[in-house]
UniProtKB/Swiss-Prot annotation:
EC number: 5.1.3.20
Top-rank EC class of the record's enzyme: isomerase
Family matches, as Gene3D superfamilies: NAD(P)-binding Rossmann-like Domain (3.40.50.720), UDP-galactose 4-epimerase, domain 1 (3.90.25.10)
Job description of the protein: Catalyzes the interconversion between ADP-D-glycero-beta-D-manno-heptose and ADP-L-glycero-beta-D-manno-heptose via an epimerization at carbon 6 of the heptose.
Protein name: ADP-L-glycero-D-manno-heptose-6-epimerase
Residues at which NADP(+) binds: 11-12, 32-33, 39, 54, 77-81, 94, 145, 172, 180
Gene designation per UniProt: hldD
CDD domains: ADP_GME_SDR_e
Similarity section: Belongs to the NAD(P)-dependent epimerase/dehydratase family. HldD subfamily.
Swiss-Prot/TrEMBL catalytic activity: ADP-D-glycero-beta-D-manno-heptose = ADP-L-glycero-beta-D-manno-heptose
Pathway: Nucleotide-sugar biosynthesis; ADP-L-glycero-beta-D-manno-heptose biosynthesis; ADP-L-glycero-beta-D-manno-heptose from D-glycero-beta-D-manno-heptose 7-phosphate: step 4/4
Binding site for substrate: N171, R182, H189, F203, G204, S205, N206, R216, Y295
Domain of life: Bacteria
Signal peptide: none
Length: 334
């Protein structure tokens, strides 16, 4: 049985491939666009059966000529995740139409389809629950994800031929994101800031939040891969699910966890947030004008629906997840 993973050389996709490998599954077709060549490193430690260029894959899907038999599932992680990309034509073709074509093909072939949605569909809302009236995306990236989620809702009412699951990822961090540049997680950037300069920067006050007090639902990519595989194991489950921890933690906590993990590797003692700020190991910079009115200052996944679907595993909190990630970066990127 073959499994297809799109975006397989990317951040979340490569972690799903790795998680499948840990189960002994290697009959995997990895689909990606390696024009950004350094992404190959994410697959170098993985076992796959074949690599297929994204554009060739799309052509074969649209023409119904994919040569693989007995496809067990498609994990669709290939998309543009740059929330600052305002090219609507590109975003809608890459995120919406590509996903729609894959959905149609999977439904025709009765293949389970698990895809990446995003918490960006909620915009600046304060309630993050999988309900239409709570969804007001702020940018074309969020809209592209939102629009496809509406397609799934309609298809579910009409009746599905095979499982379809959309995961609304919250703030994901962890190994294999180094190719993402400015779109990599704050933890990734703080690790390199601290290693280079001996301190990290956070946004100052904005939108009623104090220095570094903006909060997000930070979720480890290890947990994201686990949830994907849980639904792979339960093909009777379909729908749209938030994928976060259900906790909202301050950027201050994230920065402190990163700095203290780096300090621990240097044999230095843990410091409190107050001490880190006083010693200027955490510094605050003015909030950028370009982000005002477009920035989610608070996110917290309502994971009631995920729990009701039977997923019982605990999620890493910021400290434990960041500790694991920093150790990985020290071993692989430093």
């Amino acid at each position: 049985m073959t499994i297809i993973v799109t975006g397989a050389a990317g951040f979340i996709g490569s972690n799903i491939v790795k998680a499948l490998n840990q189960r002994g599954i290697t009959d995997i077709v990895a689909v990606d666009n390696l024009s950004k060549g350094e992404k190959f490193k994410n697959l170098a430690e993985c076992e796959i059966a074949h690599y297929l260029d994204k554009h060739e894959f799309i052509r074969q899907v649209r023409e119904h000529i994919l040569p693989y038999q007995n496809i067990e599932a498609v994990f669709h992680q290939g998309a543009c995740s740059d929330t600052m990309n305002h090219d609507g034509l590109y975003m809608m073709e890459n995120n919406y139409q590509y996903t729609l074509d894959l959905l149609n093909w999977c439904q025709d072939e009765r293949i389970p389809f698990l895809y990446a949605s995003s918490a960006a569909v909620y915009g600046k809302g304060e309630i993050f629950r999988e309900e239409r009236e709570l969804e007001k995306p702020l940018n074309v990236y969020g809209y592209s994800k939102f629009l496809f989620d509406q397609v799934l809702r309609r298809r579910m009412k009409e009746g599905l031929t095979a499982q379809v699951v959309g995961f609304r990822y919250f703030n994901v961090y962890g190994q294999h994101e180094q190719h993402k540049g400015r779109m990599a997680s704050v933890t990734f950037h703080h690790f390199h800031q601290y290693r280079e300069h001996g301190y990290v920067n956070l946004f100052g006050s904005n939108d009623g939040y104090g220095n570094g007090e903006q909060t997000r639902d930070f979720v480890s990519v290890e947990d994201v891969a686990k949830v994907n595989l849980y639904f792979f194991d339960h093909p009777e489950l379909s729908g749209i699910y938030n994928l976060g921890t259900g906790r909202s933690q301050q950027f201050n906590e994230l920065a402190a966890a990163t700095v203290n993990a780096c300090r621990a590797a240097e044999g230095k003692p843990e410091m409190s947030l107050k001490e880190l700020v006083e010693e200027e190991l955490i510094r605050y910079i003015p909030f950028p004008d370009a982000l005002k009115g477009k920035y989610q200052s608070f996110t917290q996944a309502d994971i009631t629906k995920l729990r009701e679907a039977g997923y019982k595993e605990e999620f890493f909190d910021v400290k434990s997840g960041v500790d694991r990630y920093v150790k990985w970066m020290l071993e692989n990127l430093a």
